[in-house]
């Protein structure tokens, strides 16, 4: 138990182009070694490519993609009577968002396109249409939770 009161979460500022906190969080997820300008260039370039390909507003396509990626359930390990059980549990809203963004960037990096902008744009478009590796990861997590539904009564 912590002796002091719990620490308040820091609020991120919305980005300048889309006035969205979600875009800022995505930039922070993409960022490596504190290179925020590079991360911004990657994301805004990816959004331009999304607009070229889909002829739709990129922020709307991005929101659709994130909704398709964010997990509703996950499994957590819990030790009961000397055995470990995979217990399905609901995912908190903040964790849903951070997992979705993390998976989007992670699976975009694994794609075969030339630049990171192209990789991210393709992954966003695929996720918005319900395909893509990030959506497969979510479905895999949901399948694991469904398979271990019998242990749900161990939830804490």
Curated annotation (Swiss-Prot):
GO terms for cellular component: small ribosomal subunit. GO terms for biological process: translation. The keyword Ribonucleoprotein applies. Keywords: Ribonucleoprotein, Ribosomal protein, RNA-binding, rRNA-binding, tRNA-binding. Coiled coil: none annotated. Gene3D superfamilies: Ribosomal protein S7 domain. InterPro entries: Ribosomal_uS7, Ribosomal_uS7_bac/org-type, Ribosomal_uS7_CS, Ribosomal_uS7_dom, Ribosomal_uS7_dom_sf. Pfam families: Ribosomal_S7. GO terms for molecular function: rRNA binding; structural constituent of ribosome; tRNA binding. PROSITE patterns: RIBOSOMAL_S7 (PS00052). It comes from the Bacteria. One of the primary rRNA binding proteins, it binds directly to 16S rRNA where it nucleates assembly of the head domain of the 30S subunit. Is located at the subunit interface close to the decoding center, probably blocks exit of the E-site tRNA. Part of the 30S ribosomal subunit. Contacts proteins S9 and S11. Belongs to the universal ribosomal protein uS7 family. This is Small ribosomal subunit protein uS7. It comes from Phytoplasma mali (strain AT).
